Swiss-Prot record:
Gene3D superfamilies for this protein: Telomere length regulation protein 2, C-terminal domain
Keyword Phosphoprotein: yes
Protein name: Telomere length regulation protein TEL2
Biological processes, Gene Ontology terms: 'de novo' cotranslational protein folding; positive regulation of DNA damage checkpoint; protein localization to chromosome; protein stabilization; telomere maintenance; telomere maintenance via telomerase
Function of the molecule: Part of the TTT complex that is required to stabilize protein levels of the phosphatidylinositol 3-kinase-related protein kinase (PIKK) family proteins. Required for telomere length regulation and telomere position effect. Regulates telomere length and participates in gene silencing at subtelomeric regions. Binds to telomeric DNA repeats.
Phosphoserine sites (modified residues): 417, 419
Amino acid sequence: MVLETLKQGLDSSQIHEALIQLDSYPREPVDLDASMVLIKFVIPVYPSLPERSKVILRRLASKSFTFLCQIVTFSRTISGRDGLQEIRIYQEILEDIISFEPGCLTFYLKASTTSKADRDSIKALFFGSKLFNVLANRIDMAKYLGYLRLQWKFLLESNETDPPGFLGEWLVSSFLLNPVLAADMLLGELFLLKESYFFSFQKIISASSLIDQKRLIAKFLLPYIQVIVTLENLNDVRKILRRFDLDKIISLSVLFEIQSLPLKEVIVRLMSNHSSTKFVSALVSKFADFTDEEVDTKTCELLVLFAVHNLNHSQREEIAHDERFLNGVTKHLGSNEREARERAMFIAKLLSGGHLKYESDFKINIPNVKFESNSDDKIIDFQSLKNPSICNTQTDVGKDKITEVSGHVQSLTLDCSDSDDEDENDEREIVKRIVFLKDLMKEYEKTGESRKAPLIPLLKQTVKLIRQKADFQLEVGYYAQGILSSIVCLNNEFDEPLFEQWRINALTSILVVLPEKVNGAINILFNSELSLQQRMSLLSALGLSARELRGLDDPTIVKPKFDFPTNRLPWDDQSHHNSRLVEVQESTSMIKKTKTVWKSRKLGKDREKGTQNRFRKYAGLFFYPLAHGWLNGIDVGTYNQLFKSHYLTTLRIIYSCANPVHDFESMTELMNHIISSAIEEGISLNKG
């Protein structure tokens, strides 16, 4: 009867009475039939309804998953310019439901405990992007995650004594929406906010499947903690991690991925002796292989941590006499690298209990933090976990303007002199106040209607913050991939004349500060849906970052210098080669005070040659994926010749920067083959 009444086109007071009747039903008040009537006859007038009626309508949706699903499904069928106003109404009510009704997820959960199909539908709607995709041009991902945080908060406060195991699966899906932003929202602003929330988080993980436990801890919790860990909160981090069964969750690959040495030590010290012996056996095998310097450094570091903290005297002696370990020592001693030989002897001396006589000042330093004996009894200080720091030629092709970096592009600066627009200046002030990378990333997540301001101020701030925080590798590394991906996928929506140059500058800054992120950049190049302009800009950034890492200067790249002192942790001190550079600078400043009588030209040449070559270590990461990409075939459509010419230019720049590198001959052979194929295809070689 109520549904038939609603179909007649009622006024607001009559609609209100009908909604009250629906809300009074004891069971699910809105089934499929009722949903369709409300969608067709009530929701279209939602903006004009009085607030009291809106509240009831939202409450009906919060009690009926069927109703919410039908709103989402119907919204997706609306298309075309004529439906623009209509879709906005449905978007408005959907956003109001998830923001003003924080208990809807909890209600749906309780109603679906016996049906896996229903649970999967809820997961797909909230955490599988179905709902977000409908709202995408109205709200950004950061705002959506904020709404999900409200839903999870209500769920935690509903005092479920035994959370169902599938909640861990839902939580994993929540993080996967945007791993970095979700970690900030859900961990930093909810689960690690106070003991009651963390206890619920702990119960959810404990009830989850082992694979979900590993993902929640290793893929989301540990990377987040790694960024916020300090000497002051290290004990609180230890008390958090000891709540979980790390022996089951932690693998050797996880330990290798962790860059924070103090966090690595905390995890090792929380592991049992039984698990430690298994890890050490695997580490000894890696030590014996010794194929990669970087992997070996981490292997030896972990061996020291386990030996010092988790192994007894007899276990250390057993390893010292292990045939694999002895073969590894022999292999290390035959290395041309002095540090490899020193590492092997340091560990051999440690495992032998000092009986091995070998004089050397070399040490593998570990934090070896001392915790108070009664510290386990103290509560976790969640306040200490607050994260304060997370933080050129032009070619017209049809209507698209393809910008390519060359030495003729004007020099760029970070000042505000290149715009007279007052609104842009206001936006610049807002962006300039961003000091944390997490806030920068939130700005990049803005899309559609939430993107109302020019992008150049944001790109400038990216250059400034990334280069300013160059010494904060953990923080920059945590946010870099998300920011890099967002920058590549930006469109010049406001037709800003220097947009591409600033995009390239921002990408170059990330790749120079964290060259290992080139893997992610190339993956985006090959596997993402990008426009021709986006691909060209990314290629330009790859070439320019290779040049800067090689020590070469380009006037198109902004390299701001900052007086940004860092209170570094005692185990995170600058490497010894930096101290040597300081000594040289001090000596130079003393020489300047004297009068120069005669100076050889060779002195100037030596100074030029002193430029540090950081590219050598990463040359293969830059060159080989691009080279093999060419060999696998490139086809971007109409402008394939233009793109391949720019691609080849980038590859030649990277190749020239790679010399000297140990496999330069194989690079040369591959490069010659690529150039030959380019000549056969008629690709221009006279650029670059």
